[in-house]
């Protein structure tokens, strides 16, 4: 449980996001947001809200909910959506879902929309969205099966059923965008803003 003296709270229980920020030198305390993401997202469907805007809505909801409980601490909230044409993908629930994701993405270009929000006193102070363009090579169903057998349930941890920092890189033909955007944490603009706010040493 974070305390009011924590340097920065991460509104997430993701060990990967926490490790990424700690490796960058941030003092992080995780706190799970009390947010129903699908309930927030459902009213946005069919309204013309773009996938990057959906990511921002969810990131802001996470950050401000936790910030309302810890108003004197900087809170980071993040979210990432994967969009293919007009579809927004969610994390696969099982290995069959992961297979369907990869088959749908095979040979096509999709986008990873990564939003990050800084909040304090229950209010969003700063928001940022970065977008990466991901082109997957045409992948045969048999290879997808072998790939999923090798990576196992790690495939269920990401919205695209792949981890670009691991064997998932073999699925791709080209990537346009910052590495940290691809993994869901636009770290460079976040660090720049934290330095500007004097929340970290700069």
Curated annotation (Swiss-Prot):
Catalytic reactions of this protein: N(7)-methyl-GTP + H2O = N(7)-methyl-GMP + diphosphate + H(+)
Primary location group: cytoplasm
Classification via Pfam families: Maf
Single GO biological process annotation from the record: nucleotide metabolic process
Cellular compartments annotated: Cytoplasm
Signal peptide coordinates: none
Family: Belongs to the Maf family. YceF subfamily.
Protein name, entry field: 7-methyl-GTP pyrophosphatase
Annotated organism of origin: Chelativorans sp. (strain BNC1)
